[in-house]
Amino acid sequence: MAAKIRKGDKVIVLSGRDKGRTGEVFEVRPDADVALVRGINMIKRHQKQTQTQEGGIISKEAPIHLSNIAIVGKDGKPTRVGFKVLADGKKVRIAKSSGAEIDG
């Protein structure tokens, strides 16, 4: 299946404790249907000290399910993603709400 949400996309959270917040996707894990969004779904982890890294409590992003995020359209609202094949045979993502190309 084609990736509707990709690395670098600006997304908005649809549900959960961070509902309504926006951020940039910096990692997508298609096998688990989750993504990591910068500054969203932050958790605290107790880090054991190593030779290169000092120990303590660190904050990091936890994965968020793809069904709980949506791409932000040009108007700043969440939009669904569709696909369109151009005349030259190239497949591009489009915003369902406006019909505008997302990438390409």
UniProtKB/Swiss-Prot annotation:
Record's keyword terms, sorted: Ribonucleoprotein, Ribosomal protein, RNA-binding, rRNA-binding
Query: Which SMART domains does the protein's record reference?
Result: KOW
Q: Name one GO cellular component term.
A: ribosome
Annotated GO biological processes are: translation
Q: One matching Pfam family, short form?
A: ribosomal_L24
At the top level of its lineage, which domain of life is listed?
A: Bacteria
- GO MF terms held by the record: rRNA binding; structural constituent of ribosome
Q: Does the keyword RNA-binding apply?
A: yes
Checking InterPro entries in the record gives: KOW, Rib_uL2_dom2, Ribosomal_uL24, Ribosomal_uL24_CS, Ribosomal_uL24_KOW, Translation_prot_SH3-like_sf
Family annotation (PANTHER family): MITOCHONDRIAL RIBOSOMAL PROTEIN L24 (PTHR12903)
Under the subunit heading, UniProt states: Part of the 50S ribosomal subunit.
For this chain, the family text in UniProt reads: Belongs to the universal ribosomal protein uL24 family.
What NCBIfam families does its record include? rplX_bact (TIGR01079)
Functionally, this protein is described as follows: One of two assembly initiator proteins, it binds directly to the 5'-end of the 23S rRNA, where it nucleates assembly of the 50S subunit. One of the proteins that surrounds the polypeptide exit tunnel on the outside of the subunit.
Return the protein name: Large ribosomal subunit protein uL24
